[in-house]
Every structure is written in C-alpha cells, then in structure tokens.
Amino acid sequence: MLTADDKKLIQATWDKVQGHQEDFGAEALQRMFITYPPTKTYFPHFDLSPGSDQVRGHGKKVVNALGNAVKSMDNLSQALSELSNLHAYNLRVDPVNFKLLSQCFQVVLAVHLGKEYTPEVHAAFDKFLSAVAAVLAEKYR
C-alpha cells in the first residue's frame, strides 16, 4: 500500500518524466529486450532495432499509461482495467513480463535522474510499479 509520502515522491518524480515519455519508454523496452530476450516474442511484427519508430511509439504508450496510473494511484484497478483486459484476453502476455519491464523502467529512471533517484524514491516506485503489475495481472485469475 502506498503511503502519502510515497505518493508525493512518485508525483514529484513523475513531473521529471514529463516530456521524456518516448525516450524513457523506448529505453526501458530496449533494456527489457536485451536483458530478457524471450520478451521479444510478444512483438513479432515490430522492428526491434534500437531507436525504431515502433519501439519508440510503444514505449511512449507504456509510459503514458504509467502516467495515467500516477494520476489514479488511489484507483489503479479502474484506471488500468482496459489495459488489463487487453493484455490478458487479447495479447495473452505472461504477467511476469510486467515485473520485468518495471525493473527496466526503474533502471531508466535511475540513469536519467541520478542522485534525485534516492533510495526513498526507488522504494516508492518499486511499490507503485508492483501495484501496477498486480492490477494488470488481475484478469488472469
């Protein structure tokens, strides 16, 4: 459960993500594809080369969805219901992949935010992204 302090840290950090959604998202996806190659199987129709328009476009979608989740931290289930349905019923993405992408996104945040990505921010984002992953996996039960 996110505390009031967690929510403040997440919101303040998210303000620094604004304007970089496409870059951060593409970088997180590229890290995931390199670190966890089996994740590429969910993107057979994509050009997965670094900097491809498809990876950048999907990265932007992912980070924008996270932005919507930040705005709806108190009601993630409702905010992410459509995405949960899409990934569970249409795309049939193994839910473990949400955690893998979360890890990669946290690395991107740490790289770009440097000292501003404090242990407290890391802990808050870890809780937040775990909650997002859990909500996205709800429809699999």
Curated annotation (Swiss-Prot):
PROSITE patterns: GLOBIN. Red blood cells. GO terms for molecular function: haptoglobin binding; heme binding; metal ion binding; organic acid binding; oxygen binding; oxygen carrier activity; peroxidase activity. Involved in oxygen transport from the lung to the various peripheral tissues. The keyword Metal-binding applies. It comes from Aegypius monachus. GO terms for biological process: hydrogen peroxide catabolic process. The keyword Heme applies. Keywords: Heme, Iron, Metal-binding, Oxygen transport, Transport. This is Hemoglobin subunit alpha-D. One of its GO terms (cellular component) is haptoglobin-hemoglobin complex. It comes from the Eukaryota. The gene is HBAD. Heme b binds at residues 58, 87. Belongs to the globin family. Residues 1-141 form the Globin domain. Heterotetramer of two alpha-D chains and two beta chains.
